[in-house]
């Protein structure tokens, strides 16, 4: 078999396998990179702090909760933005889910200082004291989590 012919057969086989793989996935199948990322939502909320949070909509914060719960309820005032949600059953305890949220905050906002790390409360801040943005994640009762972002 000559080189050109074996090259064509290899390409045909690869294309066939790729086609079969594409057909095997349902049309609406989720991919790993389709999972909601809390980073965009966290960054959007924190970026609003200097001018006030009232410009944010309830939907703006739901991305923070989506990896962990489906019932996020978010609201904004001029001074703060908050979301409350119920963690999925597979998240384990509220304290375990809170630790996961704190890990996301730390990963998404590497300039944030993590100054409180306890089972019921995680606290971060960004900026100098006079212009500080506070990020607090807490357990809210037996099966709820609450995230509050506030600014000066």
PLM region spans:
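C-terminal segment of classical bacterial N-terminal signal peptides
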Residues: 17-29
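Bacterial N-terminal signal peptides that target proteins for export
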Residues: 2-17
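Generic detector of solvent-exposed, compositionally biased contiguous segments
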Residues: 55-66, 115-129
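Short, low-complexity, Pro/Ser/Thr/Gly-rich segments in the mature regions of secreted, periplasmic
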Residues: 140-152
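Long, charged/polar, surface-exposed segments that mediate recognition or autoinhibition
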Residues: 69-121
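N-terminal leader/targeting segments
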Residues: 2-4, 26-79, 94-98
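Short, exposed beta-strand-loop hairpins at the edges of beta-sheets
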Residues: 125-142
